[in-house]
Amino acid sequence: MAKIAAIAPDETDEIIYLLNEQSDVNELKKLPKNKLRLALPTVCRRVDKFKPLIETLLAQGYKKWEIGNYWGLSVLPKNGIDLSFDAPLYMLNTQAMQMAKEMNAGRVTLSVEDQLDNLGLIAAQAPLPVTMVVYQDAALFTSAACIRSNACKDCPRGEKWLKLEKDGQKYQALSKDCQTMLFAEQPLCFAVEAAEIKADYYRVDFVYKSYEAAKAAQVWNKVRRFEDAANCRKANLYRCL
């Protein structure tokens, strides 16, 4: 919550909050409901454990939702909600976007793995509103396998970060809820390029790694001016296939 508190709500169109099995419903009440979009995790091993939480939040009037995997469609109603597709649901052409629209998505997110030319092309021709991620600690992969060495029965299950290195490249692995996510040391930042992409929404993401409030505010203020944060990566933006 400290990261969010550092950013004035009136500077945002909405706040995306990533749910987990232990999410505290009372914590959500501290955020403006009209701006809150609830996101389901990309990988979920225990769908049944999420259902009571989702049903509670729907009953409390939360209408904005986001999914990063098709399992989310099995636990959310087909109608009556504002549904967004996150970047792991690849939108690499307008045909994929049209299919998302037919699946009742009201918004899609451009892929952080795409090239700059294609991002501009499909954003201009999109059949529904698009979001462009301009800053994110994007997971290199998410696995439903646990990286920890201890037995499951002895595991505290809380968040644990591990540092890894291979071929001179440094990585950070997040172990949480029996899953593993691998991250590069540097975040993605497409702020400079975003100035040329006519997206409907631009997204700054502080979801996984820990950010002090002052650091989050610094990044937020910089990328809002379409300026890159320091020490960032560009992923595949300029890669030629």
Give residue ranges: language-model regions.
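Active-site pocket-lining/capping segments in soluble small-molecule metabolic enzymes
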Residues: 1-99, 103-241
